[in-house]
């Protein structure tokens, strides 16, 4: 009888530990989620801009435009690039491949409070030295006007 009692307490202890770890995991995942209000709007750096609007079902409409400025003997010059499409978002991170971009193009957008941290891998076809990578600041919460609409 004593052995059964000890065994039941041991099982209850492990069940409680398992339940507690599940709760912590769920809470940790939910802390990373962002709302539509947090992602919607216009985000800018000195030379680049993202327009973002939540479409629902973990999808975002995205439009990027960027500029790479450089000097030439004739004076200042610039390369411009843009891309648009639909991204998928999970938690606080969206993955975006602009329509018509090379297959290896991958743009990752991580929403961290008032900042948007963007990384780019692969060739995305924006133009020589034009990149989406950088840390963006939100400049508007309003629904952006998308060129594709």
Model regions and ranges:
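Bacterial N-terminal signal peptides that target proteins for export
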Residues: 4-15
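Bacterial N-terminal signal peptides
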Residues: 15-22
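C-terminal motif of bacterial Sec signal peptides marking the signal peptidase cleavage site
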Residues: 25-26
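Central antiparallel beta-sheet cores of small beta-barrel/beta-sandwich binding domains
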Residues: 31-106, 137, 141
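Beta-strand-rich cores of mature extracytoplasmic or soluble domains
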Residues: 104, 113-128
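C-terminal partner/receptor-binding element of secreted or periplasmic proteins
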Residues: 124-149
């Amino acid at each position: 009888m004593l052995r059964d009692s000890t065994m039941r307490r041991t099982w209850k202890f492990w069940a409680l530990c398992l339940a507690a770890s599940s709760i912590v995991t769920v809470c940790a995942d939910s802390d990373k989620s962002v709302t539509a209000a947090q992602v919607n709007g216009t985000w800018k750096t000195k030379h680049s801009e993202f327009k973002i609007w939540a479409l629902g079902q973990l999808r975002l409409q995205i439009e990027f435009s960027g500029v790479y400025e450089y000097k030439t003997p004739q004076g200042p010059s610039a390369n411009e690039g843009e891309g648009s499409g639909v991204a998928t978002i999970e938690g606080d991170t969206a993955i975006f491949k602009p329509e018509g971009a090379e297959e290896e193009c991958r743009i990752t957008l991580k929403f961290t409070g008032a900042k948007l941290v963007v990384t780019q891998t692969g060739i995305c076809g924006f133009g020589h030295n034009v990149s989406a990578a950088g840390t963006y600041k939100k400049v508007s919460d309003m629904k952006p006007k998308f060129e594709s609409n």
